[in-house]
Amino acid sequence: SEGVMTYAEYAAAEMDTEVVIEAYVQGKQSWWDNKVTAYLQDEDGAYFCYEMACTEEDYAKLTQGTKIRVTGYKGEWAGEVEIMDATFEILEGNYVAPATDVTALLGTDALVEKQNMFVTFKGMTVAPKKDANGNEVAYLYKWDGSGSDGDDLYFDVSLNGNTYTFT
């Protein structure tokens, strides 16, 4: 569509500039305060849309594969490249991205190029973490275990003698 960026144009865009993309919903977080945070992808790349303006009615329509046009600003927070202050419009079209195996990219700088994509890691084993009492657990809510259900989940997995932390 006219005025819509390709993924390459989006990736090359400077931070804090307006971006317009068309992509497909691959996942979403819960609706809250007339906002939604969503993971989008097309055949060329992936996008993280942080707190897009969204009615509860439209939230229900954002099922996996739904095509949307997003207008917002490219930003970054804690290494996460995202589209902020965004609005969206639902379009015709559907695409569900296949999971890309990125196991071989663990521990490399190339992994960040797959940021926000639907990915899979294979052959990994959950490695225990320690809670505040020194007990081995499979995961923690918040980095230090001080959280509860609904907070960020931290867990470790190992492969070939290396341990990786996922959030």
What are these language model-derived features?
Residues S1-T167:
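OB-fold single-stranded nucleic acid-binding module
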